[in-house]
């Protein structure tokens, strides 16, 4: 089993539990160059809010998009967009990534901006 398959397996177990609870999820995906965050409806078929380092708004604010500073901006922005749509409580779906580094910074920034999880 390689690293990617193991991560996907961890993610599927966590997602199954969140779907059973019927929770709105804050999903994070991380690549070496970018980080993506989406707030997904409980049914899993609708993206309610999203932010990523691919967006021009964020690229203008940071020099490099694959670091903790960029992750903090993404976390704050996705939280603001979710709160604007009336979403306050979410379940944090780290997609099998370790809760460390950029994933942790994004989560902390989203909490500081007002999301609860």
Curated annotation (Swiss-Prot):
An example Gene Ontology CC term for this record: cytosolic large ribosomal subunit
GO biological process: translation
Entries under CDD domains matching the protein: Ribosomal_L18_L5e
One Pfam match: Ribosomal_L18p
Function, as annotated: This is one of the proteins that bind and probably mediate the attachment of the 5S RNA into the large ribosomal subunit, where it forms part of the central protuberance.
Annotated HAMAP family: Ribosomal_uL18_B
PANTHER family, per the entry: 39S RIBOSOMAL PROTEIN L18, MITOCHONDRIAL (PTHR12899), LARGE RIBOSOMAL SUBUNIT PROTEIN UL18M (PTHR12899:SF3)
Family: Belongs to the universal ribosomal protein uL18 family.
Protein's name according to its UniProt entry: Large ribosomal subunit protein uL18
Native species: Haemophilus ducreyi (strain 35000HP / ATCC 700724)
Lineage: Bacteria, Pseudomonadati, Pseudomonadota, Gammaproteobacteria, Pasteurellales
């Amino acid at each position: 089993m390689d690293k990617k398959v193991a991560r996907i397996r961890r993610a599927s177990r966590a997602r199954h539990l969140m779907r059973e609870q019927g929770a709105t999820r804050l999903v994070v995906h991380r690549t070496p160059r970018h980080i993506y965050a989406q707030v997904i409806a409980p049914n899993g078929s609708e993206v309610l809010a999203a932010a990523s380092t691919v967006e021009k708004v964020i690229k203008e604010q940071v020099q490099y998009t694959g670091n903790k500073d960029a992750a903090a901006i993404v976390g704050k922005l996705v939280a603001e967009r979710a709160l604007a749509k009336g979403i306050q409580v979410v379940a944090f779906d780290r997609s099998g990534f370790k809760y460390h580094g950029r994933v942790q910074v994004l989560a902390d920034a989203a909490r500081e901006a007002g999301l609860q999880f």
